[in-house]
Amino acid sequence: MLPVLSHWGWSSLIHDAFEANRGVVFPPALYWPEGQDSRVKETMTGLLTIHVRRGDFTTHCKFLASWNSDWNAFNSFPGLPDKYDQVYSDPRLSSENYEAYMDHCYPSTEQIIEKVKTVREESREPLEYIYIMTNGANSWVENLKVALHDLGGWEHIGSNQDLSLTWEQKFVAQAVDMLVAQRAQVFIGNGVS
């Protein structure tokens, strides 16, 4: 195995940022033994993490659709549940295909809620905590949190906008999100980010 795969790990800057903010991800007293370091590579039981790009994706998804872009890297693994078939779903061929592409790349709040509900119902183990990774406007994130809360059953809902980061940690905020996503029990992304 390549050393970059077998010896790779997050820097102390990332771990320190996570440790300082673990209460944003899920309530500190639950499922995370006191003193257990985030460097331990265990799954965060009960955590659902969603990645919902906004901002630049307003136009970027339209470009991706016009190029008939496939899912990125790990998102294209055959074992993952959501598939994108470039041959039969080319968004350049019809408005229906274009809309289907955009549903994945830039879903509405209602589509996000429906996907979360479905994933939660199909999960073998209960999902009680949700962490939202996004570059969306604060007001949009707060509205999404309210909509998720209205589903009921969440012990905790947090987002990367709730993180309290030091000056240097702000430059690696996306890596903190990636650590959380990597360790979540379930991760929902959009396939192209």
List PLM regions with ranges.
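Conserved blade-ending motifs and adjacent loop-strand segments that build the rim/top face
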Residues: 162-172
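A donor-sugar binding/catalytic signature common to diverse glycosyltransferases
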Residues: 174-193
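Core catalytic architecture of nucleotide-activated donor-dependent transferases building glycoconjugates
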Residues: 1-164
